[in-house]
């Protein structure tokens, strides 16, 4: 059984002066080596959730427990932040160093890590995101996807238990998004890192292990991408779309071309269509 890395129990939060709760009675768990995506409309509570998990806000009710022992509070917030690393949406706003290596070691320097250990962490983190060949490059020479991979490396160098991506691909072009998504999948599969992705991108969410739908501050649905994206009508009712491959599969079904599987990527859809064509 996988180890529970984070648990929220009935957490609620209301902004001062707001008539309604931004989050209400939200409960879920994250497990070791799992990638969970949180999706929902603007105003559904996604970004508020990210801020609560990292202690930028504290819940008005309920508890957040990290690594099964540490309950988030004013007294523990700095210890919690050592366990939870965050990457935000704008790659340019996160780059604080003059070169890639300066940026990755910035957090390590702030905690006074010995140089020998710092160099080891730097090289390890850059290898994990496949940016080791860009050690001395300046930020203006990098693409958006490369900058986000450096931002992820900077977080990984601190060795947190959980990585939170708060709309980390929303400002990237398609190639940049692919680079970041491939990096996240590699980190989860090969290193067992736990990832929570707050995202508008349903193609990205389709690549994760589990999807949580937030609607008006509450969890509406939770399940695997296959389970979630089968409910296309429910998603559309709350203003969400479905991956393009799911739309195409539904159109094929209406034309009596029945597929055996739910396809979350165009590649898998094309492969099944090719197999069907080959049987003719």
From Swiss-Prot:
Primary location class: membrane
Segments traversing the membrane: none
UniProt superkingdom: Bacteria
Residue span, ABC transporter domain: 6-241
Classification via InterPro entries: AAA+_ATPase, ABC_transporter-like_ATP-bd, ABC_transporter-like_CS, ABC_transpr_CbiO/EcfA_su, ECF_ABC_transporter_ATP-bd, EcfA_1, P-loop_NTPase
SMART domains, alphabetized: AAA
Record CDD domains: ABC_cobalt_CbiO_domain1 (cd03225)
EC code(s) of this entry: 7.-.-.-
Residues noted as binding ATP in the record, renumbered to the chain: 40-47
Gene Ontology cellular-component terms listed: ATP-binding cassette (ABC) transporter complex
Swiss-Prot/TrEMBL keywords: ATP-binding, Cell membrane, Membrane, Nucleotide-binding, Translocase, Transport
Family according to the record: Belongs to the ABC transporter superfamily. Energy-coupling factor EcfA family.
Function of the molecule: ATP-binding (A) component of a common energy-coupling factor (ECF) ABC-transporter complex. Unlike classic ABC transporters this ECF transporter provides the energy necessary to transport a number of different substrates.
Name by which UniProt lists this protein: Energy-coupling factor transporter ATP-binding protein EcfA1
Lineage, uppermost ranks: Bacteria, Bacillati, Bacillota, Bacilli, Bacillales
